Amino acid sequence: SKHPNMNLVIVRENEEDLYGGIEHRLTPESVQCLKLTTQPGCERIIRYAFEYARSHGRKKVTCMTKDNIMKLTDGLFHATFDALAKEYPEIETDHLIIDIGTARVADTPEWFDVIVLPNLYGDILSDVAAQISGSVGLGASANIGTQTSMFEAIHGSAPQIAGQDVANP
């Protein structure tokens, strides 16, 4: 890796945003996808990021949004971040617009500690960060719920060897 001191955690919302599954066809020639952002959803994931930082000795939480354009949806995420940050005075905070933040992760990932983002941005940024660290296939993933969690293997699904009895799932 070009960044041997890279040590960041990406916390992404995983139920809302453009991945909420709210899509429909308007006409035969046009479709629409709606971006869902709720106060409880924002608070849940942002609080998780701060609690993770606190419990793991992390010093900084960075929020990334595109609230310069999406003033209501991403604005709610950013405003919730700013409000909750006051409950964690020992943790440094900052906010970056997602395109600038992604460029900074690509250039200087060591600058980051914990990053919290809405769903789509987190999906993209986590793959960028994994590739910077060596390979998209090396990015571990955990979906943490209040009652159930799901963990994804870092090696990929290897469909080319499925059914050959050569790998331990």
Residues covered by each model-derived region:
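Structural motif
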Residues: M6-I10, D17, K59-T62, I91-D94, ...
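N-terminal glycine-rich phosphate/adenylate-binding segment common to multiple enzyme folds
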Residues: S1-K35, L120
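Short acidic, glycine/serine/threonine-rich loops at helix termini
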Residues: G20-H24, L72-F77, V105-T108, D127-A129
